[in-house]
Amino acid sequence: METPIEREIRRSCEREESLRRSRGLSPGRAGRELVELRVRPVLNLPGPGPALPRALERARAGAQMQRDIEREAHRQAALARPAVPEPRARSPPQPLGELKRFFEAAAGSGSSAGAGDGAGPQRLPEPGGRPRSAVQGGCRVLGSAPPPFTPSLLEQEVRAVREREQELQRQRRSVYGTAEFKEPTPSLTASRGDGKLVVIWPPRRKVSENGLEQEERKP
């Protein structure tokens, strides 16, 4: 059976011969130059090489098993090894109550140092709660004075607000010209038919018109 490629080659050769005859040329030897090529299909290709001998397969499986056993032994040894002790954590900071008592005791000992020269060595509480002697190296050690009081940020803000409020009150008194200035308070009037009170702000002021006290009406 002729394949498509062989058919195409045959037709090409026939066209070439017809062209040579039409032009008076000697017939070529194209048919003689054709070479037959034998092609093997993919299914006929040789498969994988011969199987390994049984002894070689056993040796390779034994080596793999030996590696697995050694890996498991190393893992078991690492688990059985005692863990490294963790570094000791730092002691927690002393509570504020103990520090306060320590500073108070130090301040008290500093004030009574002159009166108690003939007395024995005084023992001051440490921040950890253990008493310690106030005499070190043959000389008396005075307790450290408590740190100076510094107002917190909140107290500073409150003080600044109070100062601003006092300054505003002084300015209002200077503007209104009386020392008995009072803050205006909202007035409650029943201006609706249902009897409910309505808050009017700012409150109505009484102004003088033609010598008569009248109430200022605002739309």
From Swiss-Prot:
Keywords of the record: Coiled coil
Coiled-coil stretches noted in the UniProt entry, renumbered to this chain: none
Keyword Aminoacyl-tRNA synthetase: no
Top-level division of the source organism's lineage: Eukaryota
Disulfide bonds: none
Start-end of Basic and acidic residues biased regions: 1-20, 30-39, 156-170
Region (Disordered): 1-195
InterPro entries: AKAP2_C, MISP/MISP3-like
Pfam families: AKAP2_C (PF15304)
Family, similarity comment: Belongs to the MISP family.
Protein name: Uncharacterized protein MISP3
Source organism per UniProt: Homo sapiens (Human)
The gene coding this protein: MISP3
